[in-house]
Curated annotation (Swiss-Prot):
Descriptive protein name: Protein CC2D2B homolog
GO process terms (BP): non-motile cilium assembly; protein localization to ciliary transition zone
Compositional bias of kind Basic and acidic residues: 13-22
InterPro entries: DUF5523, Tectonic-like_complex_comp
Alphabetical keyword list: Coiled coil
GO cellular component terms, A-Z: ciliary transition zone
UniProt-annotated stretches for the region Disordered: 1-24
Stretches assigned to coiled coil: 136-159, 194-214
């Protein structure tokens, strides 16, 4: 028997080790696949960046060539209107001022176009990261919502709220047993502290939910808050003598 138990334990240990190895291999495979997806998408984004950068260079070169070839042909709207509106002397003065204007004024336009294209490319890269890469790495799930009725059902299943309705004596006492009225039988009963009836009913309902809850009820069907007069409880030192007690010394309780 001991050898069989040892074999069983050894097989269980080997099975546990095999399961751990399989779980580790599955986790590694998942990590590898995720890394491969991210690398592929980064490659695609780099290729798109290269195409965008080549297009930007072509646009900038074309703008620079146009500004270099025809620097004198650039005519503003103000100059074209002044040719028809102003007189000869004023037009000649404007022409001189336009000739004195340097050709380098066209370069800021090209620079601003390049900056705008770069900003557009960066914004597109951020959108690409949000749409494709982050959706694979993160799981988006709707927020959990429960109705009020479902929450109340769960609370009722976990929390017990006792009712304030009175309990029938049959539930408090054993089967086929009637409650005893000890005062009518001549027993002395101490005065109990005043308690609201609703709180007492709640306590009785709570005790009856327990497995040994009936032990808290006496033969009268009430909660045992005071020592019962049926069972003798000695508050003094007992007489250990073998001689019998004098019957005249015994106390006899009688109801007046």
């Amino acid at each position: 028997m001991s050898e069989e138990m040892d074999n069983v334990t050894a097989e269980e240990i080997t099975d546990k080790h095999l399961q751990k190895d399989l779980d580790a291999e599955e986790n590694q495979n998942v990590v590898k696949t995720m890394r491969g997806k991210v690398r592929e998408k980064l490659k695609i984004s780099k290729i798109n960046k290269g195409e965008k950068s080549s297009m930007e260079q072509l646009v900038e070169s074309k703008i620079y060539q146009r500004s270099k070839l025809s620097p004198q042909t650039e005519v503003s709207l103000d100059e074209s209107l002044s040719f028809f509106i102003l007189s000869g002397e004023e037009g000649s003065a404007l022409g001189k001022s336009s000739e004195q204007r340097p050709v380098k004024d066209s370069y800021p336009k090209c620079f601003s176009l390049g900056v705008n294209l770069q900003n557009v490319a960066e914004s597109e890269d951020e959108e690409f990261m949000k749409e494709f890469i982050l959706t694979d790495l993160l799981k988006v799930k709707a927020a959990d919502y429960e109705d009020d009725q479902e929450q109340i059902k769960k609370q009722k299943a976990n929390i017990f709220v006792p009712s304030s309705s009175p309990v029938v004596n049959q539930h408090k006492l054993p089967k086929d047993m009637m409650p005893r009225i000890l005062e009518d039988e001549g027993f002395y009963i101490q005065r109990k502290p005043e308690i609201y009836k609703k709180t007492c009913n709640k306590m009785e309902n709570r005790l009856l939910k327990l497995e040994e809850g009936k032990c808290w009820f006496g033969e009268s069907g009430e909660i045992m808050s005071l020592p019962t007069p049926i069972k003798q409880s000695w508050n003094f030192r007992l007489n250990v003598r073998k001689e019998p007690l004098n019957p005249l010394l015994k106390t006899i309780y009688r109801k007046l």
